[in-house]
UniProtKB/Swiss-Prot annotation:
Keywords: Carbohydrate metabolism, Cell wall biogenesis/degradation, Glycoprotein, Glycosidase, Hydrolase, Polysaccharide degradation, Secreted, Signal. GO terms for cellular component: extracellular region. This is Probable xyloglucan-specific endo-beta-1,4-glucanase A. PANTHER family: BLR1656 PROTEIN, XYLOGLUCAN-SPECIFIC ENDO-BETA-1,4-GLUCANASE A. Its EC number is 3.2.1.151. InterPro entries: ConA-like_dom_sf, GH11/12, GH12. Glycans are attached at residues 106, 171. Belongs to the glycosyl hydrolase 12 (cellulase H) family. The gene is xgeA. It comes from the Eukaryota. The lineage of its organism: Eukaryota, Fungi, Dikarya, Ascomycota, Pezizomycotina. It is found in: Secreted.
């Protein structure tokens, strides 16, 4: 049966937008400028559990996705990091003018302990090891806490119109700065470059470092029948 060009294009578009679910430890799918990961990197810390991530749609630079999980055991240990990672060419911070992003998300489930965060990495060279990890927690649910050397914030800045507690601690050879929102922020729209500008001005972060990774997702510690829904996410580096 022959199809008209318009019908064929419509079918192709529908196929491209078909929902894709993956449940394996390192499962991923590439859509537009993003790689969506399941990333069950800490599942060995759990006594039981599972997780599946689903790509739902992409419109322009906006991706819609969700992840469903249940994890028990391994108290205080992160089990996974389902996330949307932006594909871009690493740039020196001094050359990064903006990192515009929007993010709308929701969580449901029982006894959820998890964070919802941007996770960004800096290196001394475009392809080198990560030297700094910059996290921006929009949600710290059920008592989830960041990496910290002291357990106390080193500052309480307001960035992008949101009040944060800022923590600092090591993750292997990396230094980790974690901006933890004082109140859960389910809808965000702003320039992530502002967080680096703050660190450059107040914590001595070098603008000669390269921005090499920009990711956003959720780190579950424990809970059951959890559904993390991202109804709107976009980010771009300019």
């Amino acid at each position: 049966m022959k199809l008209s060009l318009s019908v064929a294009l419509s079918l192709a578009a529908s196929t491209a937008q078909a929902a894709t679910q993956f449940c394996d430890q390192w499962g991923s799918v590439t859509e537009g400028n993003y790689i969506l990961y399941n990333n069950l990197w800490g599942q060995a810390q759990a006594t039981s559990g599972s997780q599946c991530t689903t790509f739902e749609s992409l419109s322009g630079n906006t991706i819609v996705w969700n992840t469903k999980w249940s994890w028990s055991g391994g108290q205080g240990q992160v089990k996974s990091f389902a996330n949307a990672a932006l594909q871009f060419t690493p740039k020196k911070l001094s050359s990064v003018k903006s990192i515009d992003s929007t993010w709308k998300w929701n969580y449901s489930g029982s006894n959820i302990v998890a964070d919802v965060a941007y996770d960004m990495f800096l290196s001394t060279s475009p392809g080198g090891d990560h030297n700094y990890e910059i996290m921006v927690w929009l949600g710290a649910l059920g008592g989830a806490g960041p990496i910290s050397s002291t357990g106390s914030p080193i500052a309480t800045p307001t960035v992008a119109g949101i009040k944060f507690n800022l923590y600092l601690g090591p993750n292997g050879s990396m230094q980790v700065y974690s901006f933890v929102a004082q109140s859960t922020t389910n809808s965000f729209s702003g320039d992530m470059r502002d967080f680096f500008t703050y660190l450059e001005s107040n914590q001595g972060l070098s603008s000669d470092l390269y921005l090499v990774d920009v990711q956003a997702g959720t780190e579950p510690f424990s809970g059951s029948n959890a559904v993390f829904t991202v109804s709107d996410y976009s980010v771009s580096v300019a």
